Amino acid sequence: MKSTNILIVAALAVAVHINSLAQTNAPVTIAATMPAHVNVALIPVPRTGGITNRQTLVLERAKAAPGDYDIEFIGDSITQGWEFVGKNVWNEFYGNRKVINMGVSGDRTEHVLWRLEQGQLDGIKAKVAVVMIGTNNSGKNKDGTDAYTDSDILEGVIAIVNQIRTRQPDTKILLLGIFPRGRGFNPQRGRLLEINQVLAKLDDGKNIFYLDFGSQYVESDGSISKSIMPDALHPNEAGYKIWANAIEPKLKELLGEK
């Protein structure tokens, strides 16, 4: 498996940080008592509580129906929503294709990594994997600090991409930019925009393809209309129609359809 682009992204991030320190003549020091940062976005962990039922269902769904698929959708509640408010659109666009939904509400990158580790993709051979994950990593702690750094989230998404590439080397990955969130523009949405700019660099035109159509959910004044995202996060049927239309041309290309 080739991971050149992923390594380049990581190297560029480090280089930019070091260069910024050099330009300010700031000394680079490491405090002996400073604990090492642990990126929990990279540590596979299962869900707890009531959502474990959905987690188990998704795992068993894949294991109960191995074989060839046209498309697999991997993500959180926004992906899971295809089965509910997005059901009519799903049937319209994917009813004649063999497609599997692997979305679990509330999932963060570490939860998807756990599912992959548990064999989510074992026995599944998909032509295309549509992946969107990371919005649930972008929240705050109770004290108002970021629960995850931008680098944490990026590394978590990249780890998922690498896992899919390892477990399904013939699968094309359609990585989607994380959807905008919040009724008006806000710092969290700004973070996601910056994260998406880096994720775009993973597109190698061969195995990984990046697509960002989040702007289609945003009005000219920067707001997200209740007519497509009632809670400013999850699409309704009209919002899923935007999603389906946005990725359809690329899906046809990757699936070899006319």
Regions from the PLM with identified roles:
Residues 12, 180-258:
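Catalytic His-Asp segment of secreted/periplasmic serine-dependent ester chemistry enzymes
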Residues 70-75, 98-103, 127-133, 137, ...:
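Structural recognition of the beta-strand scaffold that forms the well-ordered cores
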Residues 79, 106, 215:
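Short, glycine/acidic-enriched loop or turn micro-motifs at the edges of active sites
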Residues 95, 169-170, 204:
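Proline-centered flexible-loop/turn and helix-kink motifs
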Residues 157-162, 196:
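Generic structural signal for well-ordered alpha-helices
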